[in-house]
């Protein structure tokens, strides 16, 4: 089951850039498989249930106990890679929920989901999500796509052995929203030594924490996910600036607000496709299913 589910009125001087006579070609819009790739549940263990849950952790054959002390344990279900942590006193001292459960829903069948709910979740109160990873998988090559935001977003790119982009990070791990675009096919090959049949498999993943977990259905409304072709800009100085901005992210910091706005508009103009609209439409189609999946853990 695990492998099956693993196999998505600013100033007028800001004119549109002059592009080459060859028009933007019509692009085939990709399709997306959407899933929650990681969920972290937090809540407070009901005090009278502490012994029952601790005893279960100590005797269940599928659980590897990593640490066990009075009113505290860390454990892992070795079959489905489910992590469970409870710390009564740490939760109290830090004024936060004392129990945490982490898992990848894509790796769980219904029996595993029921195992989590019946043995842990039902003994917790004030349950909420502290992290949700929303994944969009597509067979389109996303190596040359970029995230464009009105706000300043840190970008980090890692290249594969063929010197092509393999993983792109937008934002920081500490932020409430952290975005990854990566070659899922290569990741599967590297980590599982499996070669999938599709020519390409890429993932756009939104790591949402804290308050952003409640906004998962609109978590990229403020972004553009584009594939700019810098060669289309005819004016040499603008073409050179666009190339520099695409390859040296720190150069955005050397521009004033108006200039940033100008070049962000140019990037949008020279991109034949913005994946955001397509992703929003697909998310709307699958939204009820995804809502039910989250609601399962809260009821």
Predicted regions span which residues?
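Structured, helix-rich domain cores that form ligand/interaction pockets
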Residues: 1-255, 270-299
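Helix-turn-helix DNA-binding segment
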Residues: 257-264
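Residue-level detection of the helix-turn-helix DNA-binding "recognition helix"
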Residues: 265-269
